[in-house]
């Protein structure tokens, strides 16, 4: 890629220096660093090309969140006001550069709660349909078929997935439609809520933003940052409420987004192990990805424990 051409297309002045290669890699793309007289920028190159229309809502939502004070990198548009530029056959976009730490599910739960409340306060009613990724089950037949394929190909995690299969199916019986649909981030795992050098956090990767139930997204956050720790769960929810967050987690169905999303992540990771691809180019990476669920599963008992924790009377 040509750093000078990237700078020109995005209206950046002075000498431009592009990193020799990607400095970060995620499931959806890679990130390069661009240094210019107008500051440092993250150049994001998606694995799967997107259209301007597909990214319009999510980019506007991130821009609105940035204006409202949510700690997130500001997107940089091209000189023509576009999200993407096509340079040398490569589709890319720019964000302001932020120095970030490693993913940490042990972040201060109160800080996480405050940030999620701020995001939910930005998002308004969203008329679009909720993506099946966040609401549909994988289904017993698909789980059984996947386990059979993994066992036949000698996947090292196949037996563990088979043991968890009945639990995954029972969890899917909890699924309920979203009650209140607003624009949400939809991807607030610890990979995307990262610590900063100043002691705060920065929320990245807004590409999946879209319609969802804030209560269901809050339940995802609750599991990710509290797990089985009742004290962390209460601290997160209390901070969320005190910061004006509009949602609550009060029944098993509020874990619908978590159950659907982790189910589909598990399915995709297993499928990637069977068929490596640019998102998961090697089987070791796919095995590690599915291990994130198998090593610390979201069982009904754990989720009910979180419900009890956040709904218990406070002293």
Give the ranges of each region predicted by the language model.
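All-alpha amphipathic helical-bundle segments outside canonical DNA-binding/catalytic cores
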Residues: 247-258
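A cross-family kinase active-site recognition segment
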Residues: 103-159, 179-181, 284
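Short Pro/Gly-enriched beta-strand edge/turn motifs at strand-loop
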Residues: 11-18, 166-177
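Active-site activation/catalytic loop segments of kinase-like enzymes and analogous catalytic loops
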Residues: 214-246, 260-278
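ATP-binding pocket architecture of kinase catalytic cores
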Residues: 36-128
């Amino acid at each position: 890629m040509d750093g000078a051409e990237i700078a020109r297309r995005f209206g950046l002045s002075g000498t431009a220096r592009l990193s020799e290669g990607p400095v970060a890699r995620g499931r959806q793309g890679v990130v390069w660093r661009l240094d210019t007289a107008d500051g440092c920028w993250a150049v994001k190159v998606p694995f799967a090309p997107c259209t301007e229309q597909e990214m319009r809502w999510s980019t506007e939502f991130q821009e609105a969140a940035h204006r409202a004070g949510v700690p997130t990198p500001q997107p940089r548009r091209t000189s023509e006001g576009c999200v993407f530029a096509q340079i040398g056959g490569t589709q890319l976009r720019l964000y302001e550069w932020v120095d970030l730490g490693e993913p940490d599910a042990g972040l201060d739960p109160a800080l996480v709660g405050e940030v999620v409340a701020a995001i939910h306060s930005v998002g308004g009613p969203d008329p679009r349909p909720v993506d099946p990724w966040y609401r549909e089950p994988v289904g017993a037949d698909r789980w059984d078929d996947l386990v059979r394929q993994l066992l036949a190909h000698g996947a090292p995690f196949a037996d563990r997935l088979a043991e968890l299969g009945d639990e995954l199916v029972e969890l899917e019986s909890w699924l309920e439609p979203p009650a209140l649909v607003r624009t949400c981030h939809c991807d607030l795992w610890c990979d995307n809520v990262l610590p900063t050098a100043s002691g705060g956090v920065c929320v990245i990767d807004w590409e999946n933003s879209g319609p969802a139930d804030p209560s269901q997204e809050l339940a995802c956050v609750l599991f990710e940052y509290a797990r089985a720790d009742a004290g962390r769960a209460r601290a997160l929810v209390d901070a969320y409420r005190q910061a004006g967050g509009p949602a609550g987690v009060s029944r098993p169905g509020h874990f619908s987004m978590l159950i659907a999303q982790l189910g589909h992540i598990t399915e995709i990771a297993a499928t990637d192990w069977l068929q490596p691809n640019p998102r998961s180019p090697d089987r070791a990476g796919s095995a590690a990805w599915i291990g994130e669920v198998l090593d610390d599963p979201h069982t009904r008992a754990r989720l009910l424990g979180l419900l009890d924790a956040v709904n218990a009377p406070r002293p």
